[in-house]
Design a protein with these regions (language model features):
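ATP-binding pocket architecture of kinase catalytic cores
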Residues: 1-81
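Short amphipathic alpha-helical surface micro-motifs
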Residues: 2, 37, 109-113, 130-131
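Weak global preference for isoleucine
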Residues: 6, 10, 21-23, 29, ...
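Short secondary-structure boundary/capping segments
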Residues: 9, 119-121
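Structured catalytic/translocation cores of nucleotide/phosphate-coupled proteins
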Residues: 20, 134-135
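Soluble or luminal CAZymes and related metallo-dependent hydrolases
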Residues: 39-46, 110, 126, 175
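Active-site catalytic-loop/activation-segment of kinase and kinase-like phosphoryl-transfer enzymes
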Residues: 50, 55-60, 64-119, 128, ...
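Active-site Asp-x-Gly
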Residues: 124, 128-129, 135, 140-175
Length: 175
């Protein structure tokens, strides 16, 4: 997989830093207009292949079914808190959504009652490993191909549809 390899984790002045390998390439956001449609199609297919590979990873038995769960077992930055605070992990997808919508409903049961179709769709979605900031400023390209994906700090176990939320187009191009 085209991701940096972790070399070490160190604490300096009370802050933790992760040292990792460098991946060659340029940010997709900076090369977007210079790439042909065929090259962009290839890069999209390359990224999708990485996603499919991530989706084959399985949670550990003790964490099975949990969401908003980082690789280290902690919560993840919450979109309900403008990504400023960690939330989770939650024991289920529905519990996660209840906490994000707690100002709208009083319980998970009420959430299910008010939105049965949405609740069913949420409950049947797969829990997969998601890159929580997979946009063009974190995709590296070289010679018209994907060369790497960076900024994995907020990735973790989330519903598969979550990946759609984070893959918004952030290019300024007219293409």
């Amino acid at each position: 997989m085209p991701v940096p390899r972790i070399l070490d984790s160190i604490v300096v002045g009370g802050q933790t830093f992760t040292l990792m390998t460098r991946i060659s390439g340029e940010l997709l956001i900076d090369k977007f207009d210079a790439l042909s449609d065929a090259q962009l199609d290839t890069i999209i297919q390359d990224v999708f292949a990485v996603l499919r590979s991530l989706w084959t990873l399985r949670q550990s038995t003790q964490d099975s079914g949990k969401v908003m769960l980082s690789a280290s077992g902690h919560g993840l930055p919450s979109p309900a808190q403008m990504f400023e605070e960690l939330e989770g992990p939650y024991d289920s997808i529905l519990e996660c959504y209840f906490h994000m919508a707690c100002h709208l409903v009083d319980s998970e049961a009420e959430l299910r009652q008010l939105y049965p179709a949405a609740s069913e769709a949420l409950l049947t979605d797969a829990i997969v490993y998601v890159h929580a900031d997979l946009r063009s400023h974190n995709i590296l390209v070289k010679d018209g191909r994907l060369s790497g994906i960076i900024d994995w700090e907020n990735s973790g176990w989330l519903p598969r549809h979550w990946q759609l939320h984070v893959m918004r187009r952030s290019c300024s191009s007219t293409r």
